[in-house]
Amino acid sequence: MSKRDFYEVLGVSKDADEREIKKAYKRLAMKYHPDRNQGDAGAEEKFKEVKEAYEILTDANLRARYDQYGHAGVDQSQGGGGHGGFGGGADFGDIFGDVFGDIFGGSRGGGRRGPARGSDLRYTMELTLEEAVRGVSKEIKVPTLVHCEVCNGSGAHTGSSAQTCPTCHGSGQVQMRQGFFAVQQACPHCHGRGKIIKDPCRKCHGEGRYQKTKTLSVKIPAGVDTGDRIRLSGEGEAGEAGAPAGDLYVQVHVKEHEIFVRDGNNLYCEVPISFTAAALGGEIEVPTLDGRVKLKVTPETQTGKMFRMRGKGVKSVRSGQVGDLMCKVVVETPVKLTESQKELLRQLDESFSGAAAKTHKPKSEGFFEGVKRFFDDLTS
C-alpha cells in the first residue's frame, strides 16, 4: 500500500514552517490518539501516519531529502529505530501540556505568558565509521526561522512600534467563563503577544522572523555512535517577538562498514585464512582502522575462533577507554584445483584414516560416532 504525501497527511502546504507543522500535528494527534479512540484500529493507523509525517517534516535533513526524493529518500534513513535518542517527536503528554498551557495561561500562575521561545530543531547527520571513530567537522545547511534584522524581531516597521493590545491590555491572555469555571486562554486579538502591530515590517510582514537556510559548522567528537546527539545552543528557530531561539540537535547515524561491525567500543571483523595456515599456524595480516597489522595464528585453529587485538577498537567519547578488535577466523576452502593438487589432497586425507582419524579429525570422528549410536538406539 503506497503512503500518502506527508504534507497531505498533516494538511499543510509544502512551504509550511515548523510552527504550522507542529500546530497541525497537535490537532491531529489529539484527534486520533489511541487513548481517546480505544479499540479503533483505523484511528490508531491514522495516529501512526500523522506521527511519521511529523517526525520527517520537523527534521531539517530528512525533510530536504523527502522534498527531493519523496518517500524513497527517507524510508531507509528511518530504519527500524526511528530517530533514536530524539524519541519520536512530541508525545501525548507534550501535546496536552501545550494545549492546556494555552487554555490556562501557560504559567499556571495567572501571570503574563510573554513571547514564546523558539522551537528546537533536529538534524540527522550520516557519518562513516572512520569519521565517527576519529571525529570530524562538517558543514550543514538548516532551513529555519531567524530573527528579522530590519526590525530586530519586533515585527514593526522602522520608525514605528508595537502598541499594547486593547483586548488583553498587554497581558496576552483573556479570561473566559465556561459554566462554573473561569479559565484563561491566549488573547485571540494579539495571539498571546500582548502587542498589536499596526505598521508591520516590510521584510518579515510583522512576524519578527522569517525563513532562511543557515550554514553551520558542526564539530563531531571522536568516538560517537548511532543515537548520540550534539546540541548547538541557540541555533534552533528564532522565538516570537524577539524571544530567544531554540536549540539545534544534531543526531548521529553511522553507516554500515564493509569490513567492521561496531558493538559499543569494540570492533568485529571476519578474517579468511588458508587451511594450511589454520593447520600449521603462522602470521597473517589483518585490517584495522589504522592500517594493517600482524596477527599470530596458533596451530590447529578452527573456523569461528576469535582472536582479540587489544586497544585496536574505538576510544570512548565519554570515558576515554579504548575498545578491542575481535577477529573471527574463517578457514577458506581452496577452489579451482588442478588434478595434481587434488591428488595431493586425496593422499593427505587417506593419511588421516584408520586409527589416526581420532587424532587428526577429532570433531568429525566424534560426530559420526554419535550418529552411529543414535541409529543403534533406534533399532535396538
Curated annotation (Swiss-Prot):
Zn(2+) 1 binds at C148, C151, C201, C204. Its main location: cytoplasm. One of its GO terms (cellular component) is cytoplasm. Keywords: Chaperone, Cytoplasm, DNA replication, Metal-binding, Repeat, Stress response, Zinc, Zinc-finger. Zn(2+) 2 binds at C165, C168, C187, C190. It comes from the Bacteria. CDD domains: DnaJ, DnaJ_C, DnaJ_zf. Signal peptide: none annotated. A zinc finger (CR-type) spans 135-213. Belongs to the DnaJ family. Participates actively in the response to hyperosmotic and heat shock by preventing the aggregation of stress-denatured proteins and by disaggregating proteins, also in an autonomous, DnaK-independent fashion. Unfolded proteins bind initially to DnaJ; upon interaction with the DnaJ-bound protein, DnaK hydrolyzes its bound ATP, resulting in the formation of a stable complex. GrpE releases ADP from DnaK; ATP binding to DnaK triggers the release of the substrate protein, thus completing the reaction cycle. The J domain is necessary and sufficient to stimulate DnaK ATPase activity. Zinc center 1 plays an important role in the autonomous, DnaK-independent chaperone activity of DnaJ. Zinc center 2 is essential for interaction with DnaK and for DnaJ activity. This is Chaperone protein DnaJ. It comes from Aeromonas hydrophila subsp. hydrophila (strain ATCC 7966 / DSM 30187 / BCRC 13018 / CCUG 14551 / JCM 1027 / KCTC 2358 / NCIMB 9240 / NCTC 8049). The gene is dnaJ.
